[in-house]
Every structure is written in C-alpha cells, then in structure tokens.
C-alpha cells in the first residue's frame, strides 16, 4: 500500500495541474477596506465585513471589557460549564433584533447549519435544496440521513414537482439561502412559501448574507419581503455584517430548546470565547441603532456606485446584494486575473471549483460600508486596465448564472 504522503502528494499535483491548488495569504492587519499583506497595503474587495464592524472601536471595547471580566477561553461546551453570561445577553438581543421568541448561538454558521439540519430531520424524511445552497447546508443534509432532493437554482416549477412527489415522507424540509453567497442574487421567498404551504413542508432559511442589510429594521430579506412570521427556522451568522464570529438560529422557544438538546455541533463543541460573544452582542445593538441604519445606507451607496462603475465598463450586474460576482470562466484565467489585480494592490482572490462549478470560476467582489469613493474608483480603474490587457484570454461578465 502506498504511503500517505505519496498518495496525498499525487492528489496535490492534480490540483496544481488543474489550477485548483489553494494557499493561504497572511494578513498582518485588522480586517478592513485596506489590509497589509507581506508588508504592503492592499485594497480589500473580498471581505464579508459588510458594515465595517470587525475593527470598530465599539466592538473592540466590548471585547476588551469581556476579556478583563471573563478571561479568554470558555473552558468547556455550553452544556458543561462554558455557557458564560454573555451568551444569555446575546441570545436575548438576537431574539429581539429578529423579532422572534427565542435564539440559540453556535460556534459558527457552518456548525449552526449542520447541527440544526441533523437535529430536525433524519431517515424517513426528505430535504429539498436549491442547487446553489451553501456547502454547510449540503453537508448537514448529507449527515442527517434524510433523502435529499435538489432543484435547479430558483426553479420553482422543479421545486413544485419535487414536493408533489414527496408526500410519503414523514417530514419535508425546504432549505434555501436568502442571499446566495457566490452569486449575490435573492431567493424568491414569496413563491417558495406558497409551495411550502401547499405541500405541508417546513421552510428553513439561511440569512447569513442578509442579516443587518435589508429592510427597515435590518433583520434580513424575510423582513423585506414581509414573510418573517411564516418561516419555520431562520439561521444567520455573526461573522459577516455583525463583524464577529459564530452562527445562530432564531424561532420558537420549542425550536431552540430542541436544538439545545439535539444539535450535536452545539452539544459537543467547546463554547466560543466569551469576549467574542460579548462583541457580537455589541454588534447587534449597533445594527439596531440609528447609527447602524446610517452605516447600512452607506453600504448600499457604495454598492450602487460600484455597480454603476462596472456598468460603464460594459458589465451589467443583476446582483441585489454587496456580492458582485465577475464571471471569468476557466480556473486558470480567474487566477491570472486575480494575480494581476494583486500586483496592482487589489486583493480579490479567485473563487474556483469546488466552491463554484468547474468552468465557472469568478472574482467575488464584495463591497463594504468602509470603502471610500476613492477606493471604488481605484478598483474600477485598475480592473478596467487589466481587463483590456488580458481580454484576449479572459471572457469577463457579471453574474455567472
């Protein structure tokens, strides 16, 4: 039998040959619109820190104060002795913010999805997924033991056809992101809810990229569409617009009690550090405030400005989020474009298979409230020049689907 290094080395060589080999670049600064890499400053257009809270003084003060009081590590899982006081405060704020009866916090959005899905359904049940649902949703579905059905992206006719044939299953769970993480487009929640009601299914939504950004109260897309009360399970993250780390689920108290008792990713994980939990509580309070409203509005002004700039370059974007995908196609071409931008001081890593389908590599450009007008113009100018220079080998377009 070949040894481990020989076999894994061969797999790595295949990744390199296919333009799929991944490396890590160390960032030697706080997260923000400008970051330091290898001693050089770069404009960062790849962050999910949409509201610029990751380095906000308010959150840093909350973190420092919590470290002074609670130390660093939680010491155990939440169900042993790791459920320090900031957890109750954060969960109360999340429930109030999301206008739900109860909330429960997980160590990450990934853990929240996997733990929730596996706690809700199993053998004898069916999960119906959008083809572009996040990997954490797919992994949770696979681990659950339930039957999995997948419908083409946002194809309501196919979703209806699948649900019509699932009447013999004990439980039917539809799961969709509200803002899709790689394309930046929005789920048709109204229509999905009609099908949920028609076929007696449950609906779970992942508001990871919507929390803090949409609707009057900034609760997410479900609020914007006016359907919050019709959703069975709402998931979100603390790591994107809220600038921290972790994931959460909001809903009925019965739901959160069930997850506390059944979600293995919660039960068997050491709790998040209390300082991060305290910072997340401060972030939720900020997002609910008038200052949070103003920060959100600044984000959308920047999104509009960048989309208008891309339009002037002939790239029309259908994105209705801060995620603006620039479709390249071939993995090698996407890597080349990303490296050319990096040489010019723009940090936008290429997104490749398996994160997106083969042949649909892209630049996933993200905008934050912290970017200045000068930052946006600098990106547009450099991107325009690079696109012309390598245009013979790169077919550039906005929105891959």
Language model region names:
Residues 116-135:
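Conserved PLP-anchoring active-site segment centered on the Schiff-base-forming lysine
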């Amino acid at each position: 039998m070949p040894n481990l290094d020989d076999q894994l080395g061969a797999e790595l060589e295949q990744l390199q040959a296919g333009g799929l080999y991944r490396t890590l670049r160390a960032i030697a600064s706080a997260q923000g619109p400008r970051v330091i890499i290898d001693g050089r400053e770069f404009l960062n257009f790849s962050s999910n820190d949409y509201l610029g809270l990751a380095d906000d003084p308010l959150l840093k003060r909350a973190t420092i104060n919590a470290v002074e009081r609670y130390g660093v590590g939680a010491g155990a899982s939440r169900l042993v002795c790791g459920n320090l006081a900031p957890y109750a405060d954060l969960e109360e704020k999340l429930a109030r913010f999301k206008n739900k009866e109860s909330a429960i916090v997980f160590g990450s959005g990934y853990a929240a999805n996997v733990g929730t899905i596996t706690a809700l359904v199993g053998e004898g049940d069916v999960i119906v997924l959008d083809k572009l649902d996040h990997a954490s949703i797919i992994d949770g579905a696979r681990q659950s033991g339930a039957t999995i059905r997948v419908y083409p992206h946002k194809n309501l006719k196919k979703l209806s056809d699948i649900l019509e044939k699932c009447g013999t299953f004990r439980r039917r769970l539809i799961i969709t992101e509200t803002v899709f993480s790689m394309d930046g487009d929005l789920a048709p929640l109204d229509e999905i809810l009609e099908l949920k009601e028609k076929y007696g299914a449950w609906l779970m939504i992942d508001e990871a990229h919507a929390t803090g950004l949409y609707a009057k109260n900034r609760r997410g897309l479900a609020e914007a569409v006016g359907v919050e009360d019709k959703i069975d399970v709402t998931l979100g993250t603390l790591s994107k617009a809220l600038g921290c780390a972790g994931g959460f689920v909001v809903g009925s108290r019965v739901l959160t009690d069930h997850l506390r008792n059944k979600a293995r990713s919660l039960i068997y994980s050491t709790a998040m550090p209390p300082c991060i939990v305290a910072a997340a509580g401060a972030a939720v309070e900020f997002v609910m405030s008038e200052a949070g409203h103003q920060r959100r509005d600044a984000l959308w002004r920047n999104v509009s400005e960048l989309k208008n700039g891309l339009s002037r370059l002939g790239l029309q974007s259908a994105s209705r989020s801060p995620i603006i995908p620039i479709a390249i196609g071939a993995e090698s071409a996407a890597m080349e474009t990303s490296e050319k931008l990096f040489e010019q001081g723009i940090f936008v890593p290429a997104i490749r298979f398996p994160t997106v389908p083969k042949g649909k590599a892209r630049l996933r450009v993200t905008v934050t409230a912290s970017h200045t007008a000068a930052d946006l113009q600098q990106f547009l100018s450099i991107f325009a020049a690079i696109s012309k220079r390598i245009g013979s080998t790169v077919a550039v377009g906005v929105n891959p689907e």
